[in-house]
Amino acid sequence: MRKPMKIAALLLAACLACLGLTGCHGDRGLSAFSMPDSFDESRDYEITFWAKNDTNKNQVAIYEQSIEDFEALYPGIHVNLRLYTDYGKIYNDVITNIATGTTPNVCITYPDHIATYLTGSNCVAPLDALFADEKYGFGGSELRYDGPDAEEMIPQFLQECAFGGAHYAIPYMRSTEACYVNKTYVEALGYQVPDVLTWDFVWEVSEAATAKNADGTYRVNGQNVLIPFLYKSTDNMMIQLLAQAGAGYSTASGDIQLFNDTTRGILKTVAQHTKSGAFSTFKISGYPANFLNAGQCIFAVDSTAGSTWMGSDAPLVDIDREKLVQFETEVRMIPQLDPENPKMISQGPSVCVFNKDDPQEVLASWMFAQYLLTNEVQIAYAQTEGYVPVTAKAQNSAAYQDYLAREGEDNEAHYAVKLQASKLLLEHTGDTFVTAVFNGSASLRNAAGQLIEDTTKATRRKQTVDDAFLDSLYSEMTSLYRLDQVSAGGGKADLGPLPGTAKALLGTLAAAWALIGLYLLWDRRKRK
């Protein structure tokens, strides 16, 4: 072979190597997980656990203690913890690691994300066989810890982890959204906080709060800054409003119904109250708790898992304490369209187990994941925020009931706002719902929130939000999130943005081909 052809062949080989590394969004073609007859304790196992904490050192300590206690029970299983503060970063890193065959063993995640992970062949282990195993399943005879039996799992929470005919996760914690209300300001405006907030009430009070003094300060707080109604997660806002209105969002099979007339009406209402200064969002203005605690917000909607940041006496604050304003805080369900039939979202982290070539490694991973359902872990972690344990075993335990009974005893572990947020979900679990999970549901959720964000931004920029604007916005969201490619039944469309590593490898591939072409052209001219 002539020298130029040898060099070209080497460059081509490099290209093919790069192509192999990029994969097809990580389709490694693992064999389906098969449950071993028993756990091989003669071996050592090293498993990785990717977890999220809410910038809360108590949560980190619980993860570390859980690992230490589990390893004491199973000396041959070593758990390596990697902490994140953002679910989106976990999602992106998992996608990247699917492409390179280096996923973690156990991961805190959301079902919407798992639906995308499943586009890799047998990438996530289905858990039904593990649930039912007599030795190592729920309440298994060979387990060295006291975990929940199958009937002690809260059915609704467990069902949230099932899609495509199988369970691909177990619930870890559950929360919902709550409206944290500055009762002092509501009453100063001449209103009383009802037991169940309605959207009409919140909009009316928020508009009343925009009144100003002659010097430009707001009458209700005497400050230059006030956002009466501030929403943290606008995807949840849109989803819950559609559910309360009985309007479409998506079907279980993945048919998208978001872009309807009810959505159009919601966005026009958002524009109306944004224009008056009564409404804004976290992405645009900032963290609701900061505004609430500074006396610059009246209705702050955030997760019950953020309750320790809410209120004048909150144990966690993200502003200078001298900026705190004293007021009475009330915790309520999110605003409702029909107070007699409330609807609110169920959310919170779940745990999935990734498939591996070695079934014993998967079983070891499952045993650790299931350990996170023990009372010791469930109760301890639930106490860090307004979370609720996902097992009846933990919820009904004397330790957890004692914790709930001590509401307001102090402003740390028993902070009143936090416990009221937990009780809100415990009392209204039957009023919660989840959206359908399919490949593309994560993108649909993002689009739902972005509709509100872009409408709010446009209004603040003095744009007119009319039907023509909304038609254009619908088209933009469909294109941006590739919603026209999401197929009913959860096909291969909409795998989310390609990870940066894969983009880099594809760039290398293109550069290598270009070098081949340039080299061959140079060689041809040289020989002439």
Where are these regions (language model features)?
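Extracytoplasmic/periplasmic substrate-recognition and gating elements
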Residues: 272-274, 278-279, 315-394
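Long, aromatic- and glycine/proline-rich binding clefts that accommodate carbohydrate-like moieties
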Residues: 329-336, 382-456
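C-terminal motif of bacterial Sec signal peptides marking the signal peptidase cleavage site
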Residues: 22-23
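Hinge/lid segment of periplasmic solute-binding proteins
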Residues: 39, 111-176, 218-219, 320-335
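Conserved C-terminal helix/tail region of periplasmic/extracytoplasmic solute-binding proteins
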Residues: 416-528
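Extracytoplasmic/periplasmic solute-binding protein
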Residues: 159-172, 177, 200-256, 297
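Glycine-centered hinge/linker elements that transmit conformational signals in sensory
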Residues: 205-207, 252-283, 329-330, 334
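Early extracytoplasmic/lumenal segment of secretory-pathway proteins
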Residues: 44-49, 53-115, 290
